[in-house]
């Protein structure tokens, strides 16, 4: 991809990308602040709330980093040096991988939380809250090692056009790598993503079975003239299934666009589309939490009421 072409991409694409980043930053900030206030408040909170706060913070940092990269792609105010390129691209890749793993673990933890007492997962219910901090630390160390090659493969974009460099932004490019070296870095990533997607598929399948069982119970309750309102378990199950549906759709689109880019030498527009699609989930997911979690809605309403009374 020619570095000059990024500056001449259609204005609508630039606006879409920057708007997506801005909306995502705002939504994740609201979600993180809401959960942080609930965690620091006197009200009792669920152990999984801490993990949702961690996920929203990770997504917020990812979008902020992407915003800085997007500015250098379209509106370069000054060339970055090699250290800035390596640090920002490394941080972005690290946060992107960490977000994927955190989403997967949130799915698994939610499955454990909603499992019945007779389920084989019930024995983990009282164990996982005590291991969340350790899981955070393990994930950070793991994904720091996964992304470490960007510290040595990222360099300042040369002034002269070269087909051997892969342009990331106006200031940063990836150094050319041999096929064996590329495979050495890409294989662990492929294995990681395959494992995480499979784990999410299994937990989502369990969720579907759980939702079907609750639906049968609801039909029985209606037949006995009892309340037919959705239970907290049903609402939580629908929330996580909705999140996973968004994740799968955006992941498939991202994969299709990535392979399409590989077929074109000058895929600047596809490159921007891939960035938009790959960050769509982290932009949409906080809205799912905000709109479906009743305690978040109540908290935001109370905050708005306090602000209005000031």
UniProtKB/Swiss-Prot annotation:
Topological category with respect to the lipid bilayer: Multi-pass membrane protein
Keyword Disulfide bond: yes
Single GO cellular component term: plasma membrane
Result of knocking out the encoding gene: Mice lacking all but one V1ra and V1rb gene (12% of the V1r repertoire) show a lack of chemosensory response to a subset of known pheromonal ligands and changes in maternal aggression as well as male reproductive behavior.
Residue spans, topological domain Cytoplasmic: 42-50, 115-131, 212-238, 290-310
Disulfide-linked positions: 85-172
Protein keywords: Cell membrane, Disulfide bond, G-protein coupled receptor, Glycoprotein, Membrane, Pheromone response, Receptor, Transducer, Transmembrane, Transmembrane helix
Entry-listed glycosylation sites: 159
GO aspect biological process, one term: sensory perception of chemical stimulus
Annotated transmembrane regions: 21-41, 51-71, 94-114, 132-152, 191-211, 239-259, 269-289
Extracellular-facing ranges: 1-20, 72-93, 153-190, 260-268
Keyword Glycoprotein tagged: yes
Record CDD domains: 7tm_V1R_pheromone (cd13949)
Compartment list: Cell membrane
UniProt GO molecular function: pheromone receptor activity
Chain coiled-coil ranges: none
Annotated InterPro entries: GPCR_Rhodpsn_7TM, Vmron_rcpt_1
Domain of life assignment: Eukaryota
A family per Pfam: V1R
Stated role: Putative pheromone receptor implicated in the regulation of social and reproductive behavior.
Family the entry assigns: Belongs to the G-protein coupled receptor 1 family.
Protein name per its UniProtKB record: Vomeronasal type-1 receptor 44
Organism: Mus musculus (Mouse)
């Amino acid at each position: 991809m020619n570095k000059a072409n990024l500056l001449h991409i259609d204005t609508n694409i630039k606006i879409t990308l920057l708007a997506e980043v801005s909306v995502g930053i705002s939504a994740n900030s609201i979600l993180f602040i809401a959960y942080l206030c609930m965690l620091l408040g006197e009200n009792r909170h669920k152990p999984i709330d801490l993990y949702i706060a961690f996920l929203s913070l990770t997504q917020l940092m990812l979008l902020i980093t992407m915003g800085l990269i997007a500015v250098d792609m379209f509106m370069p105010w000054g060339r970055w040096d090699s250290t800035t390129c390596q640090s920002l691209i490394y941080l972005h890749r690290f946060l992107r991988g960490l977000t994927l793993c955190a989403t997967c673990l949130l799915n698994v933890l939610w499955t454990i939380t909603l499992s019945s007492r007779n389920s084989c997962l019930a024995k983990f219910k009282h164990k996982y809250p005590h291991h969340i901090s350790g899981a955070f630390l393990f994930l950070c160390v793991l994904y720091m090692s996964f992304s470490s090659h960007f510290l040595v493969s990222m360099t300042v974009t040369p002034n002269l056009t070269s087909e051997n460099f892969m342009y990331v932004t106006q200031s940063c490019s990836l150094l050319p790598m041999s096929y064996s070296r590329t495979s050495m870095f890409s294989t662990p990533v492929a294995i990681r993503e395959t494992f995480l997607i499979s784990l999410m598929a299994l937990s989502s399948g369990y969720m579907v079975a759980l939702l079907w069982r609750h639906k049968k119970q609801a039909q029985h309750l209606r037949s006995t003239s009892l309340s037919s309102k959705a239970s907290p378990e049903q609402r939580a199950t629908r929330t996580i299934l909705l999140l996973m549906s968004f994740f799968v759709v955006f992941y498939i689109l991202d994969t299709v666009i990535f392979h399409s880019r590989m077929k074109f030498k000058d895929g600047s527009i596809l490159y921007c589309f891939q960035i938009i699609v790959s960050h769509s989930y982290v932009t949409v997911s906080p809205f799912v939490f905000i709109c479906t979690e009743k305690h978040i809605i109540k908290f935001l309403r109370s905050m708005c009421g306090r602000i209005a009374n000031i």
